[in-house]
Amino acid sequence: MPSLNEIRSTFLNFFGGHGHEIVDSSPLVPRNDPTLMFTNAGMVQFKNVFTGLEHRDYNRATTSQKCVRAGGKHNDLDNVGYTARHHTFFEMLGNFSFGDYFKEDAIPFAWDLITKEFGIDKSRLLVTVYHTDDEAAEIWKKHAGLSDDRIIRIPTNDNFWMMGPTGPCGPCTEIFYDHGDHIWGGPPGSPEEDGDRFIEIWNLVFMQFEQFEDGTREPLPKPSIDTGMGLERIGALLQGSHDNYDTDLFKTLIEASAHATSVDPYGDKNVHHRVIADHLRSTSFLIADGVMPSNEGRGYVLRRIMRRAMRHAHLLGAQDPVMYRLVPALVGQMGQAFPELGRAQALIEETLMLEETRFRQTLDRGLKLLDEAVADVPEGGALPGETAFKLYDTYGFPLDLTQDALREKGRAVETEGFDAAMADQKAKARAAWAGSGETADESIWFDLAETHGATEFLGYDTEVAEGQVLALVKDGAQVAQLAEGETGWMVLNQTPFYAESGGQVGDSGGYLKSNGSGAIHDTQKRNGLFAHKVTPKAQPLKAGDVLEMRVDPARRTAIRANHSATHLLHEALRQALGAHVAQRGSLNAADRLRFDFSHSKALTLEELQKVEAEVNAYIRQNSPVETRIMTPDAARDLGAQALFGEKYGDEVRVVSMGRQSGSGKGVSGETYSLELCGGTHVKQTGDIGVFVTVGETASSSGVRRIEALTGEDAFAYLSAQDYRLAEVAASLKAQAADVPERVRSLLDERKALQNEVAQLRRELAMAGGGQGTAAPEAEAVAGVPFLAQSLSGVSGRDLPSLIDEHKARLGSGAILLIADTGGKAAVAAGVTADLTDRLSAVDLVKAAVAELGGKGGGGRPDMAQGGGKDASKADAAIAAAKAVIGG
């Protein structure tokens, strides 16, 4: 009996032996189809190949595609665990032809594989065809030898596939297996077709037409093939069961769940183990493909799946987290076929444990409330919607989890009341928004967020991705289109463009579409939406357009380097200055970075050099930059740095870089820098290139600011500095290495000359030389010796020392000196100690300054200084001082 792994290999090798390229599964988050929440079919990754928008090096392919159906119209969540074939995660085996072969080869390929390679009894097989597809029916007769009664013609769209209202389409043929009359059910097309006797195992789609808007169809020049066969279904059949949960893979997971909970795997609690086994697969693969639990979008679907599994673990009596303990069993079963599962194992386990721990804190209280409420609801009745909403709003119970719990009790949920309570909450939120002071222009973003939900950000993994235009905004109002050359704002369902936040500027770039293009100037965050400032260049831009979004790669690279450098800078400052250093703000632009941090004084040159050297040391280390998702508390317990004043949600992204011995902080190893951050970063620290500080200043009280450059900008700055140094060296007629000593020597020489000049000025002033108009000898004013001089060629700094020299010469008296400093006046007055009890130098200065066009003046009774605007009024100033003495 072949295992599922062997069946997968047989399928892929069969088609590989028939010239098909064996292509790896694409991620569960589709990159080329923004209309899909998750990849749900094998053809998703080939959509653009089928439509001619993409060319590959092969024209036939085969895959085993990871698929999830748990959101949107493809939502199997409620049935999972209770039926034989519903899953949230499954593998779709498929073979594809892109204009190479068609029906005459596709049907024989399928028949030969299932009857010869898999050895399925031909007598158990029957097929359906579209009622007008005589060609397919004839091939089945000719190659498989099927009689007319085993070729069922279906007139409905069940056997006609369409990619959309327009575009490629064509008939299908499906292969069914008859499990026998001991199982209830009828053949396809019969009233009993929903039974389990006849099970579809393979669907072959013949893309042979193109449908136009008027409903007409024309043959495609190169018809193509798209087939899909569920691995779990064919596996159950080949292992002798009609229940997918009886296959070897699910048995392993169910038994692991039973071991972890100490509950019989196949007793009356079996359904709980089945739910856990299925949900373990979908949650693990979603996390491995980059989806993290959240309250919106794909993350919310993941959280719903996780919490549903966790409730079933609770029903098995589990008191501690269970699901993370089952991951090794899953990796053992599927890790070889999907290596990404093993690579992400630690992240999967940690995410599951954190989510289950957090949810368990509210699960008991929520279930108690539910039990109390159900006591008042008769069997077959419905729980009031308001109660279900309280469970959702207060305890984080998704509606489908409550419905799932009630189904086991024979009750339902009154969904109209739930919807009404949800609408009421939104109305209150809208009223709060309206009263918050936001402008009418800004309130449009609340409406759009309520309608469309948060934008899915893809930019951690790619700089190019498709997105569908959900809304266009111009002058604060929603518009249907933006004309060529008109600038407005654009919202998409998903985008690779980073919206400005956390100090990192928004991305810019452009977009392409089938018949046009445009420029994206900036990206801003508006109430959870990513708003792109856009100008169409060729053709108008319309709501509903599907765009290929392209981030400016050079600009993004520079921004990433600067952002990662701020993380290294933050830790280097903490190492150099102390643990008190904390981020107070930052700017991570393409051409520079700015980092504000708590510190009370300017950094010394030695401190700056130490910080710069340490940052560059970790750049040269070229260590990987890693990201993890965890709770804020868990991140802080690890020592992660958080932005001052920032509010964080239930999960945070933790960025780590650099390795050092003995730090003990690392998520994996001894991490140098560990920060909560939602921005984009380099993959290796070496990608930063080089780091150089260009300024250190005060930002505000107790906050310093460092400005710096990285990468090409840093190299350009260093090159310019080197050129300037060479110019200085040439001017000094010295080698570059000797410039500092040569400059110090010149400065010492200059200082000596300045001192000599100052001394000569003082001597000249004391001698009454120069252009002084007052006599150097004192005159008696009201019995007080008073010496006054108006001087030129003397600076204000020289006046106090001249005052002291005059005091020493006079012995007793008052002095007033006025220096002409380019038309303005510097004033100083002095009074000897024996006279300060009756005369103050401050009063003399104030009187003089008033005449010179100045204000104030101050100092001590024995020495005061001031200044005025007009030195030509020196005589009047001296007279005013005399009046003070004589007064």
Curated annotation (Swiss-Prot):
Gene3D superfamilies: 2.40.30.130, 3.10.310.40, 3.30.54.20, 6.10.250.550, Bira Bifunctional Protein, Domain 2, Threonyl-trna Synthetase, Chain A, domain 2
Superkingdom to which the source organism belongs: Bacteria
Essential cofactor(s): Zn(2+)
SUPFAM superfamilies, A to Z: Class II aaRS and biotin synthetases (SSF55681), Putative anticodon-binding domain of alanyl-tRNA synthetase (AlaRS) (SSF101353), ThrRS/AlaRS common domain (SSF55186), Translation proteins (SSF50447)
Regions that span the bilayer: none
Keywords: Aminoacyl-tRNA synthetase, ATP-binding, Cytoplasm, Ligase, Metal-binding, Nucleotide-binding, Protein biosynthesis, RNA-binding, tRNA-binding, Zinc
A single BP term in Gene Ontology: alanyl-tRNA aminoacylation
Record has RNA-binding as a keyword: yes
First-level EC class: ligase
Subcellular location: Cytoplasm
Catalysed conversion reaction: tRNA(Ala) + L-alanine + ATP = L-alanyl-tRNA(Ala) + AMP + diphosphate
CC terms in the record's Gene Ontology section: cytosol
GO MF annotation, one: aminoacyl-tRNA deacylase activity
Keyword flag Zinc: yes
Record's cofactor remark: Binds 1 zinc ion per subunit.
E.C. number: 6.1.1.7
UniProt-annotated binding residues for Zn(2+): 563, 567, 677, 681
Domain statement: Consists of three domains; the N-terminal catalytic domain, the editing domain and the C-terminal C-Ala domain. The editing domain removes incorrectly charged amino acids, while the C-Ala domain, along with tRNA(Ala), serves as a bridge to cooperatively bring together the editing and aminoacylation centers thus stimulating deacylation of misacylated tRNAs.
Family, as annotated: Belongs to the class-II aminoacyl-tRNA synthetase family.
Function summary: Catalyzes the attachment of alanine to tRNA(Ala) in a two-step reaction: alanine is first activated by ATP to form Ala-AMP and then transferred to the acceptor end of tRNA(Ala). Also edits incorrectly charged Ser-tRNA(Ala) and Gly-tRNA(Ala) via its editing domain.
Protein name per the record: Alanine--tRNA ligase
Native source organism of the sequence: Dinoroseobacter shibae (strain DSM 16493 / NCIMB 14021 / DFL 12)
Gene name, Swiss-Prot/TrEMBL: alaS
